[in-house]
């Protein structure tokens, strides 16, 4: 499961994890036993950022070759606020659309999710 977080007013929240690359990424995680994809999204967003989810929309599914799994992509509108980061998140920030596009690495699921979210919402 992977989530692109937006405040609905043009800002996107991205995180940089302590254990991964130095790049900014979308919130993502694995579904636990007896958990729906939506419950996983809510849990991961709360755990990694401390942000409150206001709305969630399924966008698409994506194959993630690194772990040989299928990721379900969501666009989540969250309440813009201060981050409360987990131990696995080094830093997080709010970024405008163009900056967020630049920060997400080319060829990643996060970049694809952003592209597809924009297409579904305003035809770009």
Question: Model regions: which residues?
Answer:
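Unchanged
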Residues: 31-116
């Amino acid at each position: 499961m992977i989530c692109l977080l937006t405040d609905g007013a043009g800002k996107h929240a991205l995180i940089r994890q302590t254990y991964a690359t130095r790049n900014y990424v979308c919130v993502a995680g694995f579904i636990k036993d007896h958990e729906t994809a939506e419950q996983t999204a809510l849990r991961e967003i709360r755990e990694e950022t401390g942000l409150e989810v206001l709305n969630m929309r399924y966008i698409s599914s994506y194959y993630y070759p690194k772990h040989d799994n299928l990721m379900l992509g969501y666009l989540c509108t969250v309440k813009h606020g201060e981050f409360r980061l987990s131990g696995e998140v080094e830093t997080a920030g709010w970024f405008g659309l163009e900056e967020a596009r630049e920060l997400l690495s080319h060829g990643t699921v996060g970049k694809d999710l952003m592209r597809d979210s924009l297409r579904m919402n305003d035809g770009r």
